[in-house]
Every structure is written in C-alpha cells, then in structure tokens.
C-alpha cells in the first residue's frame, strides 16, 4: 500500500539504513560568538544532502527550467557542539509521511554525525516540494519510491521532536500580529521587531531570493562595517558577572514564499513559552509593503554560562522582560 503525498513522492513502508550524502570539515570561519559551529552551517550541510538525496533517488528530475525544488518545512534538533577541524558526515533518506503530521510534499530525515567521536551533532526532518518559479505555487509532479528502495528510512526515537510541534502552524496576518508585538527588546532569541532589505546580490537571475539563503540571515545580516565582529548570538552578563547567551536546541522553519530584490522584510518575534533555563519563541516574516507572509520560524533555546559551558537559570531581569512580553496563545 502506498503512502500518498500531494506533491511528488509516494512511498511504501520498508525501511533501510541512512545513506552518506555529504562529507565536510568544520572551518574556522564557521565558528560563531559561542565558540562552536553556527546553526547556519548545519543548515548548509543538510541542504546539500537534501539535494543529493533527490538526485540519487531520481525524485528530482527537472522537466523544465521554470521549476525548482524548495525546502518548505525544516525541523532541526541540535545535540552536541562541533568545533573547528571536526569531520562531519551528513546521512539521510526519505520517510513515509504517516510518521509525521507535516505539510504535504516529500519528507526526509537527516543526521549530521561526527565519525571520530561517534556523536550525532544534529538531526533534521525536512519536507520539500516542486515549485513553479514564476507563480511560486507547488507543482503536482508525483513520483513513486518502490517498496524495495534503499532510500526509504525511519526516524529514530532520538531524532523526533522534543518540544516543537510538527503540525501545520496557525499563520496569522501582518495586521493581526504587529499590534501585539512589544517595542521592548527582550535580550536574545531575536524577539521584537527587525527590518532589512533584500539585496540584488542575494537573488537569482529572476530577481528572487535564492533558495539556499535563509530569511533570518537576511534580516539579521551584519553591516559592512561589522565584518570583523564575531557573528552569532549576542553575549550578556548577569548580576554575578557571568557571561551568558542563548544556545539553540530546536528550530522549525516553514516557508510560504520567497521575496524579491528590493523588498523590505519585517520580522516580528516574541516568546511563546519559557521555563527555568529555557525559552521558546516564534517569528513571523512578512513583506512590509504588501503584508505577504513569507515564513514562520519557531526556536527553543537554553540559557548557558559561556565559561562553564552549562545551562543556568534565566537571569531575573531577562525573565521579567519575557514575562511582560510573551504570547502564550501562539505556543
């Protein structure tokens, strides 16, 4: 019996081992302000692996230049820090969609492993779809993965979400979200309001933001005069003088559309839940002038002592700011 996916992948439930799809070594330039490989470079590796999986399996066969493959839903779980010089292998395979409650499309599971330590550095559940470049609409281009396909795998228990839901998110509009976002900037986790412009050099030959560029990195890019400043989460100090910041543990990003060169993008973010040492946030990204929803991003992070490299309770001033501004109705 086939498991149906609207989009381009149908699969039968017979699972095999994960397949090696990408190999790399962590470069010094990929190390951020927390002293470890930044989230964006995990995403770079898994995006390459996703394309490689499509090619090897024969799922991604471009029929005309007006169609492309897009990651429309990306769940990430980060497990162990990786440092400069570490060798990393990215492995994965397709999964039956009945294992998840995600949006339609072809869903795959990936892991980034350190073969020297044996650690699983991060795991991912990704849904991709064929998209018409001109209309930005999904294309119905069904393909079947046979029951004996070596590319069909199962999500291990440790790769499943811990805190975030993979259900279809409630979207909301710019008119609904903007009035409830406070002007107060709660330290860390990209809360509050942020704006930036899509540069021409960020775009493909059609003038649309390239598929491999994450909207969050457009919104929070460094200015040219900040090239020598370490990138990554900002550093803070508590009343005891400890250096602390926020380490991302889980993320989920859903893409609805890609902006064009010159578009002004606005990100509206707030905490939706928190505990003694952690917080969960949601960010909505819109084209400012039209109100078009581009994407929704959820993040779970823990407060860490940067010197002791361990989780600590959220400092009181930050906790109070979270309490004043959080939006539990969006959790």
Please place each PLM-identified region on the residue numbering:
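Intrinsically disordered, low-complexity boundary segments flanking structured domains
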Residues: 5-13, 56-64, 112-117, 177-185, ...
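HotDog/MaoC-like acyl-thioester-processing domains
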Residues: 18-22, 73, 77-87, 94-176, ...
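Long, contiguous hydrophobic alpha-helical segments, chiefly transmembrane helices and signal peptides
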Residues: 24-26, 31, 37, 42-46, ...
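Active-site helix/loop of acyl-thioester processing domains in fatty-acid/polyketide metabolism
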Residues: 41-63, 212-245
